[in-house]
Amino acid sequence: MVSYGDAVLVLLEAHEVVEPLWVACAGERVKILDDGFAWLFVLHEGARHVVTAHCDAAGEPVHWYVDVVEDWWMGDDGFPVYADLFLDVVATPGGSVELLDAAELEAALAADVVTSAQYELALSEADRIVRALQGGRFEPAVRTREFHSAARSVTGT
C-alpha cells in the first residue's frame, strides 16, 4: 500500500496463474489476469468510487472496474474498506464503457437497504464516471500508468 498525493494505491501482482481470467465488458472479451498481470486499487481521498485497474505484464491497463461507494476508510488491519452502493462501471482502453448492477441498486432501494439519498448519490456518481470515461477525462484511468509505476517503485518489483 502506497500513499501517493491524495490517493492510496494498493498493488497486487500475479506471478504465476493456473489459468487466465477473462471477463466480458460491453461486448468485448478482456483478459484481466495472467502471469505477470497486476491489479491496482486506486482510492482518492473524498472520492465516491474505488477503482481497480487491471494491468497486463507490461503495466498497460486492459480494464477498469469502478465501484461506486458512499465512502471509504482505512480498516483496523491497515487496508482500505468501503461502503458499496451497488453500482459499478467497467471500461476498456478501447473505449467500451458499461454500467453494471442497476437492478441490484433498485432492489436495495425497494428493500430499504439504501436510502433515497444513497440511491441518488449512486446514480449521480455513476453518471459522472461514465461521462468522464467516455470523454477520456476519468483521472484514475488517465493516470493508471503513473499510479502503477509509483506503486511498483515502492514495492521494489
Where does each model-flagged region fall?
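Charge-rich, low-complexity N-terminal segments
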Residues: 1-37
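Well-ordered beta-strand positions
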Residues: 1-3, 43, 90-91
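Residues immediately flanking
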Residues: 14, 68, 102
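A short, polar/proline- and glycine-enriched secondary-structure boundary/capping micro-motif
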Residues: 21-22, 75-77, 108-112
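Phosphate/ribose-recognition catalytic cores of enzymes acting on nucleotide-derived substrates
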Residues: 34-74, 80-87
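A long amphipathic alpha-helix within ATP-dependent nucleotide-binding catalytic cores
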Residues: 66-69, 73-76, 80, 123-136
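A hydrophobic, small-residue-rich beta->alpha segment in the mid-to-C-terminal subdomain
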Residues: 85-129
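Cysteine/selenocysteine-centered motifs that mediate thiol-based redox chemistry or coordinate metal-sulfur cofactors
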Residues: 124-157
